[in-house]
Amino acid sequence: MANENHGSPREEASLLSHSPGTSNQSQPCSPKPIRLVQDLPEELVHAGWEKCWSRRENRPYYFNRFTNQSLWEMPVLGQHDVISDPLGLNATPLPQDSSLVETPPAENKPRKRQLSEEQPSGNGVKKPKIEIPVTPTGQSVPSSPSIPGTPTLKMWGTSPEDKQQAALLRPTEVYWDLDIQTNAVIKHRGPSEVLPPHPEVELLRSQLILKLRQHYRELCQQREGIEPPRESFNRWMLERKVVDKGSDPLLPSNCEPVVSPSMFREIMNDIPIRLSRIKFREEAKRLLFKYAEAARRLIESRSASPDSRKVVKWNVEDTFSWLRKDHSASKEDYMDRLEHLRRQCGPHVSAAAKDSVEGICSKIYHISLEYVKRIREKHLAILKENNISEEVEAPEVEPRLVYCYPVRLAVSAPPMPSVEMHMENNVVCIRYKGEMVKVSRNYFSKLWLLYRYSCIDDSAFERFLPRVWCLLRRYQMMFGVGLYEGTGLQGSLPVHVFEALHRLFGVSFECFASPLNCYFRQYCSAFPDTDGYFGSRGPCLDFAPLSGSFEANPPFCEELMDAMVSHFERLLESSPEPLSFIVFIPEWREPPTPALTRMEQSRFKRHQLILPAFEHEYRSGSQHICKKEEMHYKAVHNTAVLFLQNDPGFAKWAPTPERLQELSAAYRQSGRSHSSGSSSSSSSEAKDRDSGREQGPSREPHPT
């Protein structure tokens, strides 16, 4: 049921205008719920339950002042209390039907019908006995977004203007659907051992990451005479976390090998100079001259074999001679000559620079290792000050099947410091110790809803703003603070496509998302510590569903995409239940990425769809703060859509021609026209901006 004690969304203005200390006689008072004679058992009263009267429905209901949960029926004794038993370990197990999936009490209300529920499975596999995890149902989850009462808002310490408070939680544009329930089934798991986030720790981490980025820039400039390859530091962090076994959620500290293949490859591809795309003949001529000059300078300044020096110098002199003689060459002639020079000199130049580039990669890793130690010491000191132990006895986990639920942390969260918040037009600004992060009003409302759905240790929202600050700061530092930096690594599919995926293939879960760019309220993300409070199920590579339909749009990091394919194939191989992954990755062919090649050859591949470049869109990775006209951008490369399904998954969510046609039609609906009818994306300036955002990793360049 909707939160009866809070009223409906239509009543939000009157409810929010009534708060102690701000109401006056000229303001209308909100109707207070009538408290009935409390004839409840003493156990329920101690648990926070009381009996109230609904004027709208003209019947009694039961309200929990601790969790804000409302029920029509009297609460059942034996259900777990989220305060004393947040994980529900001592809860009385609910009776289960071996052939049916039960629905939790908080979800026994009308909700949207899902196509995946209406269609027969099409296979004879017996449905598993699936229990609903008690942890995420400790709080009532409304079937539609509703605005809470003033008392909750007042506990945030926000502006005293009640109308402004109401506006914060009333989105004007919505790019998500948090009503969709999950069909992802997992084995019940224990809480995560990562330490809970704290603004003081996050502030130190962000300062050290900025220093590490600066170290990387200086090493590239001083040792190789180049600027750091675009997004290479961001992809280094993504690639390192695939193999990292360290304690920090962001910085690597325990990796093998020490030299990152991703960082090494991208720096080497920019040596001796970065080859950019050219349009005109004179640009091609200058590029050829710069490459020859840089190759000669590098081979003379490094220790190289006499044969290597001879080959490079001879080819460089031959190129200079050709440039002096031929004044009628076309753009294609210059590019052919450049390609010939790269083939002749490239191996020798790379061999001469190899030790230096490995030194850069090793140096950055060891600096990161020292920074992680400092962050860890700071974090443990804060926990010790609050008498919180990092050593928590792991609870016993029952081996049962449950619907997926957000990550829970084993270590208790320490008290949070105060965080300031103010509004600038439609932007919410949150400040801690002079460091400010920003998020649009619409996405602030989204974070509030996700927090309300997922968080179980802060029913009064006293820690909401500090946790939002930590979340925004974490993603800001992960992808950099430059213009459009990192936005391509956080891009997501348009709303129309998500709607089609859910309607046609029963998709209800994103494998690579964040609280900021997710469409569903169930998703995997990079950071279980900051994101778990907002619905994250943890990192995708640690998430092991037994059944369900999933969308996967990974960051464009080759090592991460390759690890994703291995993970998906293991899951499809081991599960007898319907399991489906719809994967969206760039169609890079020169050379092809291992992930794309493996999926095309996989026995689980049921279909492959190619979306042409500049004929489909992504939503910006900075959608939570960017302008409306920049919300969507054209993809500058083809996108491959691959359907990986086991046999039961194929029988249930088969990519039939009719469904594929509808999915392609969804891509033809431009999100730009949806969000801004007056903006135009056909200009060359817009294409250049999109290209900057969508920049892939430095691969073998083809500057044509």
Curated annotation (Swiss-Prot):
Gene Ontology annotations of biological process type: methylation; mRNA processing; negative regulation of translation; positive regulation of translation
Alphabetical keyword list: Methyltransferase, Nucleus, Phosphoprotein, Transferase
Entry GO CC: intercellular bridge; microtubule cytoskeleton; nucleoplasm; nucleus
UniProt-annotated stretches for the region Disordered: 1-33, 88-151, 663-704
Binding locations of substrate: 235, 265, 558, 588-592
Regulation: Cap-specific adenosine methyltransferase activity is inhibited by zinc.
Family per record: Belongs to the CAPAM family.
Assembly and oligomerization: Interacts with POLR2A; interacts with the phosphorylated C-terminal domain (CTD) of POLR2A.
Name of the protein this chain belongs to: mRNA (2'-O-methyladenosine-N(6)-)-methyltransferase
Organism: Homo sapiens
